[in-house]
């Protein structure tokens, strides 16, 4: 059944090699979904689809490994049950969050409207380059601020201009990620640090979105039997 989606299968293999506890937890969850109130989502790495594959390296750089391996629960009761069964009983080392009561996705507003963003040379915010269930996206906005990190695929952004702009503190231009901080005193002078994006590894398998949708529909049909 996993092979109905090559992307899912390949990312599961990443977890099988790098985080055996998370991989085993996914297998357990697949067999026990019926005990939960709502869907408990597999780790972020498995749930995220790239709607713009050219952003995969940038997205992977923005998502730390702890974030990538995190399970997302929609309710506190499901979080308590999941962690009791797998962390307390089995002593598995897992990252788990619950989103009950967290702020809605719509409240994560970008620092600049799209027209102003494009005028600065950017193509999109990181959040616009991915798709995932709403609660997973809420978690990624909270943990990784994807709604506030713009990306310029061709690297046309001027760092000095961005320092004067001041509303965007972290951005990606070409193969480089920039982070600007401001001093706490006096004229609050800016300081910008940059580093090359991480090599693309875990999100290398981006797949075809139409194929992904067909695979998801097939999985749901099988699960409904």
Model-identified regions with their sequence ranges:
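Low-complexity, highly charged intrinsically disordered N-terminal segments
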Residues: 1-9
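Hinge-like oligomerization/junction regions that interrupt long coiled-coil arms in large cytoskeletal
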Residues: 9, 13-214
């Amino acid at each position: 059944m996993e092979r109905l989606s090559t992307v899912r299968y390949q990312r599961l293999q990443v977890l099988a090699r790098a985080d055996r506890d998370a991989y085993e937890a996914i297998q357990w969850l697949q067999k026990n979904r019926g005990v939960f109130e709502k869907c408990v989502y597999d780790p972020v790495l498995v749930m995220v689809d790239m709607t713009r594959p050219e952003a995969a390296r940038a997205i992977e750089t923005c998502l730390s490994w702890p974030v990538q391996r995190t399970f997302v629960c929609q309710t506190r009761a499901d979080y308590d049950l999941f962690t009791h069964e797998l962390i307390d009983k089995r002593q598995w080392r897992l990252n788990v969050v619950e989103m009950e009561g967290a702020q809605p996705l719509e409240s994560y507003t970008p620092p600049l409207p799209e027209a102003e963003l494009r005028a600065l040379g950017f193509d999109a915010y990181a959040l616009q380059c991915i798709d995932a269930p709403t609660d997973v996206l809420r978690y990624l906005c909270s943990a990784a601020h994807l709604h506030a990190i713009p990306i310029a695929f061709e690297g046309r952004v001027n760092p000095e201009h961005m320092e004067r702009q001041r509303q965007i503190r972290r951005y990606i231009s070409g193969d480089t990620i920039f982070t600007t901080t401001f001093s706490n005193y006096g004229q609050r002078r800016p300081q910008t640090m940059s580093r090359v994006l991480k090599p693309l590894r875990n999100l290398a398998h981006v797949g075809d979105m139409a194929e992904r949708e067909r695979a998801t529909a097939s999985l749901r049909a099988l699960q409904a039997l």
